[in-house]
A protein has these predicted regions:
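Fold-independent oxyanion-binding glycine-rich loops
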Residues: 1-4, 24-26, 50, 83-86, ...
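Short glycine-aspartate micro-motif
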Residues: 19-21, 106-110, 130
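A short glycine/serine-rich beta->alpha loop
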Residues: 42-51, 138-143
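Generic secondary-structure signature for well-ordered alpha-helical cores
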Residues: 69-73, 100, 104, 132, ...
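Acidic/His- and Gly-rich active-site-bordering loop/insert found
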Residues: 1-48
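Acidic/histidine-rich catalytic neighborhood of metal-dependent amide-processing enzymes
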Residues: 49-124
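Short glycine-enriched loops at secondary-structure junctions
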Residues: 24-29, 35, 114-116, 123-127
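Acidic-enriched catalytic cores of C-N bond-cleaving enzymes acting on peptides and small amides
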Residues: 121, 143-168
């Protein structure tokens, strides 16, 4: 476990190849205690968070098991990481902590997509911000029209952000 709470495992290669990071995140969008089990129907598994990103953790372990059981040798080291704080206000915190502490990674693969036929190469980055709007506020009935409402300023800001043109 590293300083960011990530679970890290290293499978050594011969030292003659790139150092590869393969990661999936531990957290889900569901609050703790939401998952009470996994249900199987028609050969499929169902549970909150199973596609984002519990499946990736199973894939990390499955890949490691397959490499070891088949005695597959790699040239480069493979670092397996189950990262923290990907969802919501986590802002990819676990991954950022890991990369800040490990600047020797040559290639990074992230498993985080329900459609395994899709491979995304060089995706854009993201930033997470917390913005607070303060004001006097007031009851909608008793103070209607008498003072600025912070919620109105927040709504205007969100509307302007939604109008941004994202580079392609």
């Amino acid at each position: 476990i590293d300083r960011g709470g990530n679970v890290v495992g290293l499978r050594r290669g011969s030292g003659k190849g790139p150092k590869v990071l393969i990661e999936g995140h531990l957290d889900t969008v569901f609050p703790f205690g939401t998952v009470h089990g996994v249900e199987e129907r028609d050969g499929f598994l169902y549970a909150p968070g199973i596609g984002d990103d519990t499946r990736a953790l199973a894939m990390l372990l499955g890949l490691l098991r397959a490499l070891n059981q088949n005695e597959i040798k790699t040239f480069g080291d493979i670092v397996f990481v189950a990262t923290t704080r990907e969802e919501g206000m986590g802002g990819l915190g676990g991954m950022k902590d890991f990369l800040n502490d490990n600047d020797d990674i040559d290639i990074s693969l992230t498993i985080d997509n329900n459609d395994m036929s899709v491979l995304i190469f060089e995706a854009t980055s993201g930033e997470t911000y917390e913005v607070n709007f303060y004001g006097i506020g007031g009851h909608a009935f008793g103070s209607f029209g008498e003072m600025a409402q912070p919620i109105h300023a927040a709504a205007r800001a969100v509307a302007k952000i939604a109008d941004f043109t994202v580079p392609s």
